[in-house]
UniProtKB/Swiss-Prot annotation:
5-methyltetrahydropteroyltri-L-glutamate binds at residues 17-20, 117, 518-519, 564, 608. This is 5-methyltetrahydropteroyltriglutamate--homocysteine methyltransferase. InterPro entries: Cbl-indep_Met_Synth_N, Cobalamin-indep_Met_synthase, Met_Synth_C/arc, UROD/MetE-like_sf. Its EC number is 2.1.1.14. It catalyses: 5-methyltetrahydropteroyltri-L-glutamate + L-homocysteine = tetrahydropteroyltri-L-glutamate + L-methionine. It holds the Pfam family Meth_synt_1. The lineage of its organism: Bacteria, Pseudomonadati, Pseudomonadota, Gammaproteobacteria, Enterobacterales. The keyword Repeat applies. Zn(2+) binds at residues 644, 646, 668, 729. Belongs to the vitamin-B12 independent methionine synthase family. The active site is at residue 697.
């Protein structure tokens, strides 16, 4: 039986981020809808051709999205929130953009749909909204149009469709509460119609994505799979597709389904292939996701060959990417500045397609020449194991020497708080900001000129110093109590630290989509991490010299740096996090020596690092908390440690939030009207809290009365003596005029509350 290969999806944005540029040009009114549609058409044609040329047997169609593939599915099903609908009920690309962004070149602006993380990745999807009794109909034929495009170009294709149960699982009920699973029978006819249309076009296989099957689903959701797939069977062959984790716990549900094939993620999952092979119906096709779609490392194809060869001829087999290649940059050949040795360890999306082709050929015809080709390809990643760039004996020794004392502050919080009160003598309702101030065109230009060699180090430092001086003066004028230096020198909160730590490398063009038109370029962790010299001390010390008020030192925490980078695969995430923590522990010590008495360690990614299955949460939370404490615990008792977190759900991890033992935690609460504080109240959270009093994602300036009302609400839940006053998040994306006004109102609200207490 001949093995075929396929990818589950391909990056959409284009090698030069053409899609991003076309979207933003269209949104700004600088190009027409037809010009935007043409860019999409060109990108799809190019990506199909590139995959085919790299040796992919079946190219995916339906993985392209103008904003997000879950949003595309919503439109396919005619699921458009009332506030985003066209007057005549039609659906067009502007409908899609109104749901994603809240506005488009046509139609009335309305609040955008909610956005959240796609499983445990750094990609975000638009959350479908459901209401009781809503109607569904085939409303957006993008998938069928793209299938026609690909067939006209002569490609062998496999359409991709987000499965009905995962789609419902990912959505939220709006308005009156009801069980959204009850909508299953209403959406299935649309799926049937789409599959019938694909069958008419001669399509043999459809990839139907049900990643919810890797989760611990409630029984009623698992029970829904059988009738759902009973309704969908018969028109085309269905490849039930899972990714991001194992499926063993749901295997009984899966193997009873009327589908013709199953895709499993063999990279992130830990399913025993022999057991899986034995447990599945004999006639099923088994697709094995062996090439990691979420990282940038070259595969050891020789190892995969040895692992997979026993399965050859046991059943129909396909080889695929573990998940969509959406999460990987496009082409390693674009990287001209990477060191040759390091570059030889990497594979981006196009290289991963070539890996699939090479491995498939070897398994189909395992002759000496093919095996030698596999060995030659795998040699660099094998040589990496002993590279001096990867291993640092000092880091490994230091890690091994960590004791339980290294992760605990000297005194408990109550005693520390007393010494800190004496040192800082802050008023009631102390005011501060989260860290960054507006990143003006001037600041960005300064950094770019320095990076590209147009500005020498001395002039760059002079320029940054001026911006820090301005930030301190602004805060003094506003009357804030604890100041920040404004982070003018930082491009990105993770990239900045990665650039100053050994063990990281950076790409020129390693862009991946985060959401909509937003792309990120994650650093790559290639080896043991250490800090060759102080990173933030010079700027913090300078800022502190300009004022009598305390200035916070600002660090990005170890878990966030790990989660927002491409990690190495040869050691555990725990090991990487603790190496970063040790490097930043030295930074805490140096900041203290420089006279900085308040140090903030941001951990916005702590919650998003959670494994998909609750059974694995405790182990993760244990080492994530330990990494934070290892970073912070070197601080003296009178040094106040702050942390900042921005997400909407604390209930299920309150124990761990408290275990961080930060003296002050600042959180994002304004959009939830302080409801988030319920978690802290119910838990009787013992330390100090700064609930965000205004939403920095909006240019709207909150009134003094509005902020005051929010603070009063907060004081009903948390004793006023433990409350701080601050915005939700950093102010880097805002302009100075609204920043000044909002902070002035915030300070005034705090002053009014203080006066009441006198």
């Amino acid at each position: 039986m001949t093995i075929l290969n396929h990818t589950l999806g391909f990056p959409r944005v284009g090698l030069k981020r053409e899609l991003k540029k076309a979207q933003e040009s269209y949104w700004a009114g600088n190009s027409t809808q037809e010009e935007l549609l043409n860019v999409g058409r060109e990108l799809r044609a190019r990506h199909w051709q590139q995959q085919q040329q790299a040796g992919v047997d079946l190219v995916p169609v339906g993985d392209f999205a103008w904003y997000d593939h879950v949003l595309t599915t919503s439109l396919l099903l005619g699921n458009v929130p009332e506030r985003h609908q066209n007057a005549d009920g039609s659906i067009d690309i502007d409908t899609l953009f109104r749901i994603g962004r809240g506005r488009a070149p046509t139609g009335k602006p309305a609040a955008a749909a909610e956005m959240t993380k796609w499983f445990n990745t750094n990609y975000h999807y638009m959350v479908p909204e459901f209401q009781q009794g809503q109607q569904f109909k085939l409303g957006w034929t993008q998938l069928l149009d793209e299938v026609d495009e690909a067939l006209a170009l002569g490609h062998k294709i496999k359409p991709v469709l987000l499965g009905p149960i995962t789609y419902l699982w990912l959505g939220k009920v709006k308005g009156e509460q009801f069980d959204r699973l009850s909508l299953l029978n209403d959406i299935l006819p649309v799926y049937q119609q789409v599959l019938a249309e694909l069958a008419k076009r001669g399509i043999e296989w459809v990839q139907i994505d049900e990643p919810a099957l890797v989760l611990e689903l409630p029984q009623e959701w698992l029970d829904a799979y059988q009738p759902a797939y009973q309704a969908l069977q018969g028109q085309v062959k269905l490849l039930l597709t899972t990714y991001f984790d194992s499926i063993g716990h749901n295997i009984d549900t899966i193997r009873a389904l009327p589908v013709q094939g199953l895709h499993v993620d063999v990279v992130a999952g830990h399913d025993d292939l022999a057991v899986l092979n034995k447990n599945l119906p004999k006639e099923w096709l088994l697709s094995l996701g062996v090439i990691n779609g979420r990282n940038v490392w070259r595969a050891d194809l020789s190892s995969w060959f040895e692992r997979l060869q026993p399965l050859v001829n046991s059943r129909p087999l396909w080889l695929g990417s573990s998940c969509s290649l959406l999460h990987s940059p496009i082409d390693l050949n674009e990287e001209t500045r990477l060191d040759a040795e390091v570059k030889s360890w990497f594979a981006f999306a196009l290289q991963k397609c070539a890996e699939l082709a090479l491995l498939t050929q070897a398994l189909n015809a395992p002759n000496d020449a093919k095996l030698a080709e596999l060995a030659a390809y795998s040699a660099p990643i094998r040589a990496r194991r002993s590279s001096s760039r990867v291993h640092n004996a000092q880091v490994e020794q230091r890690l091994a020497a960590i004791t339980s004392q290294d992760i605990e502050r000297q005194l408990p919080y109550e005693a520390r708080a007393e010494t800190q009160r004496k040192r800082f003598n802050l008023p009631a309702w102390p005011t501060t900001t989260i860290g960054s101030f507006p990143q003006t065109t001037e600041i960005r230009g300064l950094r770019l000129d320095f990076k590209q060699g147009r500005l020498d180090g001395k002039n760059y430092r002079t320029g940054i110093s001026e911006h820090i001086k301005q930030a301190i003066a602004e805060q003094e004028r506003l009357g804030l109590d604890v100041l920040v230096h404004g982070e003018a020198e930082r491009n990105d909160m993770v990239e900045y630290f990665g650039e100053h730590l050994d063990g990281f490398v950076f790409t020129q063009n390693g862009w991946v989509q985060s959401y909509g038109s937003r792309c990120v370029k994650p650093p790559v962790i290639i080896g043991d991490i250490s800090r060759p010299e102080a990173i933030t001390v010079e700027w913090a010390k300078y800022a502190q010299s300009l004022t009598e008020k305390p200035v916070k030192g600002m660090l990005t925490g170890p878990v966030t740096i790990l989660c927002w980078s491409f990690p190495r695969e040869d050691v555990s995430r725990e090991t990487i996090a603790k190496q970063i923590a040790l490097a930043l522990r030295d930074e805490v010590e140096d900041l203290e020596k420089a006279g900085i008495g308040i140090i903030q360690i941001d951990e916005p990614a702590l919650r998003e690092g959670l494994p998909l299955r609750r059974a694995d949460w405790q182990a993760y939370l244990q080492w994530a908390v330990d990494a934070f404490k290892l970073n912070a615990a070197v601080a003296q008792n009178d040094t106040q440690i702050h942390t900042h977190m921005c997400y909407c759900e604390f209930n299920d991890i309150m124990d761990s939030i408290a275990a961080l033992d930060a003296d002050v935690i600042t959180i994002e609460t304004s959009r939830s009207d302080m409801e988030l504080l319920e978690s802290f109240e119910d838990f009787a959270y013992p330390n100090e809290i700064g609930p965000g009093v205004y939403d920095i994602h909006s240019p709207n300036v909150p009134s003094v009365e509005w902020i005051e009302a929010l603070l009063r609400k907060a004081a009903q839940r948390i004793p006023a003596e433990r409350l701080w006053v601050n915005p939700d998040c950093g102010l880097k994306t805002r302009g100075w005029p609204e920043t000044r006004q909002a902070l002035a109102n915030m300070v005034l609200a705090a002053q009014r509350l203080r006066e009441e207490q006198i």
